[in-house]
Every structure is written in C-alpha cells, then in structure tokens.
From Swiss-Prot:
Species annotation: Corynebacterium efficiens (strain DSM 44549 / YS-314 / AJ 12310 / JCM 11189 / NBRC 100395)
Pathway: Cofactor biosynthesis; 7,8-dihydroneopterin triphosphate biosynthesis; 7,8-dihydroneopterin triphosphate from GTP: step 1/1
Superkingdom as given in the UniProt entry: Bacteria
Family membership: Belongs to the GTP cyclohydrolase I family.
InterPro entries: GTP-CH-I_C/QueF (IPR043133), GTP-CH-I_N (IPR043134), GTP_CycHdrlase_I (IPR001474), GTP_CycHdrlase_I_CS (IPR018234), GTP_CycHdrlase_I_dom (IPR020602)
Catalytic activity: GTP + H2O = 7,8-dihydroneopterin 3'-triphosphate + formate + H(+)
GO molecular function: GTP binding; GTP cyclohydrolase I activity; zinc ion binding
Classification via Gene3D superfamilies: 1.10.286.10, 3.30.1130.10
Record note on quaternary structure: Toroid-shaped homodecamer, composed of two pentamers of five dimers.
Broad class of enzyme this protein falls into: hydrolase
Name this polypeptide is given: GTP cyclohydrolase 1
NCBIfam families linked to this entry: folE (TIGR00063), PRK09347.1-2 (NF006825), PRK09347.1-3 (NF006826)
Amino acid sequence: MADKLGAVREFDQERAEAAVRELLIAVGENPEREGLLETPARVARAYREIFAGLHEDPTAVLNKTFSEDHQELVLVREIPIYSTCEHHLVPFFGVAHIGYIPGESGQVTGLSKLARLADMYAKRPQVQERLTSQIADALVDKLGAQSVAVVIEAEHLCMGMRGIRKPGAVTTTSAVRGGFKTSMASRAEVFALIRGN
C-alpha cells in the first residue's frame, strides 16, 4: 500500500532478521548466545505486526457504511493506541478520541471502524501530529463526514526512557475539519464531550 508519503514495499522477513542481527553486533552483543539466537526472527515478526498499517488502505477500513439519516455527532472516546516514533523507533501510546458528524447523506460507519482506522494509521513509523491528521482526513475523504474532530493523548518513550527522560509526560494533538474548524461553538462543544464534561 502506498500513500502520499511514498511507496511502500512488502515486508521482507529475511532482510529484517539480518538487520536485527547486525544491530545486535553493532551495540556489542553476541547474536550467537543462547538468549539471542531467536531474537532476530522474533523482532522481525514483531515488526511485521507493529508496522502492518503500512500495508492497509483506509478505504478498506471504511468501506461499510449504514444509511441512518443521522446528522448529529458520533463520538468514540478513549480508544487505546500504540504506535512507533519514526525518529527513534520506540513506542508511543495513549488514547484517541474520534468524533464526526456525517455528511448530508447521513451515512455512518460502524463504531469499531473508528478504532480500526486509528490502529491502521498507528501501525506505521509515525509522528503523533501526522497520525492525528491522517485519521481526520480519512473520515472526510473516505466517509464524507462534514465535521471531524480527532484528539490524541500519548506518552512517548523517546522522551521518557532516553534524551530528556521525562516519563509520564503526555502530548496532546488535535485535528479538526469542516464545521468543527469553522465554528468555535461547535468546536467547544465537541472538545467538552471529549473531556467527558
């Protein structure tokens, strides 16, 4: 699957295993010792799963809709997300809040599709800002939503376990589209609901 960020090749298990083996050697480890013998294969399999979103298409995730003639907010809060910082290849994790108002057709998608959409984009080398925008844009482009609000709150291990070492710090990003972008009252309402007020 390729998108505007560039072409994506199929996962290469053998190449991934060789790269992990070389990394172990580069950091001073012995990949032949008992505890590390299977590590290259294990890490490669884990990365196949962790980065599975590179090979998924948002159109396939949002392909099933229902005609409910619903013109009001649909909001799913506190969807757990796990992603990988593209700068350091360490995890960031937290929750996504995804809300939308259907387009004029009143088409809605299943609630689980919102979680699947978040997972699909999270399972890539990512930055939180892009992840937030990709989810919002997919709901506009693929579902035809007239208004979208996405908020992600996440802890980044690249900040917690290395560098500045501030574990527990939470980064919040938002992306608003349509009416939530143009109407301050609508934006305030959806953000209050996201906060649980």
